[in-house]
Regions:
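Short, small-residue alpha-helix embedded
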Residues: 300-311
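Phosphate/diphosphate-binding glycine-rich loops and adjacent basic-rich segments that engage nucleotide
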Residues: 150-210
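A generic, well-ordered mixed alpha/beta core segment in the N-terminal half of proteins
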Residues: 90-157
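Acidic, glycine/proline-rich low-complexity segments that act as flexible tails and inter-domain linkers
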Residues: 2-104, 116-122, 269, 283-292, ...
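Glycine- and other small-residue-rich loops at beta-strand/loop junctions that grip anionic moieties
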Residues: 100, 125-127, 168-171, 209-213
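Residue-level signal for inorganic ion chemistry
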Residues: 59, 141, 196, 304
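A structural signal for small-residue-enriched, beta-sheet-centric alpha/beta enzyme cores
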Residues: 186-289, 293-297
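General beta-strand structural signal in soluble alpha/beta enzymes
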Residues: 122-126, 148-151, 166-168, 192-193, ...
Length: 333
């Protein structure tokens, strides 16, 4: 005899998170953006693990399809920051590194090392190797002697010894890391990849952000402006914070909530040929002065200048300082 499920005679109560999914997914005419307050509440429920997995997937993919608004990103960021238990450490630059590189080596890592040698305190954070065929910061930390920190105390110690630290996202926002890790389950990157770039967990003086896809740079700048943050957003090479010297670079800035724009000319007369393959040992060779190569030196000098611009130096002065720092670097590694 077959046992049948009982009939549903009463309408089940709606899940508290359901309205947020409905707002985003209610058809072409019925759907709308979340307000900043709604975004803060929705992200708070995600972080507090008060949603079903099906709701999480639906929410992330609806956002991905729609594209996040500045108000949504600001609200999401506020929810994350409210739940952080980070110490009050003095930091100059927040340097998110989530994209990975595939066309050029991550020369920006040498830029960060050189800045740190000159007293610029930098926090780097990333979300691991989520996409095949890319070279990620986490894979190079040991060889480049960038401290891998697993808690804020280790970050503080690293700052005291060398002004540079990397901490994985999963060690200070595990729920966000879980969402990023859905990349290969859902088949698409989620909006968390974008959100992570805004978080600036230690409230650094300036947050650098790289957004590769056209049109998104202004959205991120506007979101940071709503938060009152000081940031520079660029279209960095491969989605990482690295100036491409072969192209014009547009800087989308926000200082204390006030927007500004700046355009930097290309640094090379003609485009460089991309390497046939990525050889990480070339990073150390360039640092040690064993090889000379136009592209990486232009890229890392300009990237250092970008960080210095974020700390208030005018462009020309930032480039002069960056060149001085690079020429005088401690080449041991």
């Amino acid at each position: 005899m077959t046992d049948f499920a009982p009939l549903t005679l009463e309408t089940p109560a709606e899940h508290p998170f359901a309205p947020f999914v409905r707002i985003l997914g209610k058809g072409k005419r019925g759907a709308r953006n979340l307000t900043r307050e709604e975004a803060r509440e929705a992200m708070g429920m995600l972080l507090d693990e008060k949603v079903e997995d099906t709701q999480l997937g639906a929410f992330l993919m609806l956002l991905r399809h729609k594209e996040e608004s500045p108000e949504e990103l600001a609200g999401f960021t506020e929810a994350v920051r409210e739940r952080l238990h980070a110490p009050a450490l003095k930091v100059d630059i927040d340097w998110p590194t989530y994209a990975g590189k595939k066309r050029h080596l991550p020369w920006f890592l040498l830029a960060a090392k050189c800045l740190a040698q000159n007293g610029v305190r930098i926090l780097m954070h990333g979300g691991g190797a989520h996409t095949a065929g890319r070279l990620y910061t986490e894979q190079l930390l040991e060889s480049l002697q960038i401290p891998l920190c697993r808690n804020w105390q280790q970050v503080e110690t690293a700052f005291e010894h060398g002004n540079l630290a990397f901490i994985p996202l999963g060690d200070w926002a595990p729920q966000l890391q879980r969402m990023i890790d859905l990349r290969n389950t859902l088949g698409l990157r989620s909006p968390i990849h974008s959100l992570a770039r805004l978080l600036n967990p230690l409230n650094a003086r300036c947050g650098l952000q790289s957004i590769f896809h056209p049109g998104y740079q202004g959205v991120h700048r506007d979101a940071s402006g709503l938060l009152g943050d000081t940031v520079i957003v660029v279209k960095g090479d491969g989605g990482e914070i690295e100036i491409n010297p072969d192209t014009i670079s547009h800087l989308y800035g926000s200082t204390g909530g006030e927007s500004w724009d700046e355009e930097w000319p290309a640094l090379a007369a003609q485009r460089h040929v991309k390497p046939a393959s990525l050889e990480p040992e070339q990073l150390k060779a360039l640092w040690r002065g064993e090889v000379e190569d136009s592209y990486p030196q232009l890229a890392l000098i300009a990237t250092m200048a970008l960080a210095l611009r974020g700390l208030g130096h005018p462009r020309e002065q930032a480039f002069e300082l960056a060149q001085q720092y690079w020429d005088a670097r401690d080449k041991s590694i």
